[in-house]
A protein has these predicted regions:
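Alpha/beta-hydrolase superfamily serine-hydrolase fold, recognizing
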Residues: 1-166
């Protein structure tokens, strides 16, 4: 396939990897995909956004309990140490925290996120980055839904979500 027939995408940490893949391809002057789809992208592993709080964790049945455990049991602000080695943590590095990247020249991107999920601010921050950098994008925030709700294939919203990818 040629690059204009390829879209990349991922959910959660896979959304992070999709965003970082674009940055790396552009840095290497490689062909870019035609489009990107990010479902609840973990674009701020440093957890600097406003949605990283107890209230949102209580609403998010998928990752809320994990983050609450990280916050209380391990006294950590974020889970970034599970993503990169402690000595490599640099939240200003866009290859770790895409919210700090320059997305000029990025192909069109679709982001979908649950309005009741812990990573909500990650998606909102990425939309701000895309608007700043002139990236064509589509954004859908699903009311009363949690992180990667699309995994529940029985929900009507999951079906509608996947129909939007066409």
């Amino acid at each position: 396939y040629s690059n204009d027939e390829i879209a990349i995408g991922g959910d959660s940490a896979g959304g992070n990897l999709s965003l970082v893949t674009f940055l790396k391809l552009r840095e290497l002057n490689e062909a870019l995909p035609a489009a990107m789809i990010c479902i609840s992208p973990w674009a701020d592993p440093a957890a600097t956004g406003e949605s990283y709080n107890e209230e949102m964790a209580d609403k998010d049945p998928l990752i809320g309990p994990l983050f609450k455990k990280i916050w209380s049991k391990f006294n950590m602000k974020s889970a970034i140490g599970y993503y990169v080695k402690k000595e490599d943590v640099d939240q200003s590095n866009p290859f770790i925290c895409p919210i700090n990247g320059d997305f000029s020249g990025c192909p069109p991107v679709m982001i979908q996120v649950g309005a009741d999920e812990l990573l909500l601010s990650d998606s909102r921050s990425m939309i701000n980055v895309f608007e700043r950098d002139g990236v064509i994008h589509e954004y859908k925030e699903w009311e009363n839904l949690w992180h990667v709700f699309q995994l529940d294939g029985e929900m009507e919203e999951s079906t509608k979500s996947f129909e939007m990818f066409r």
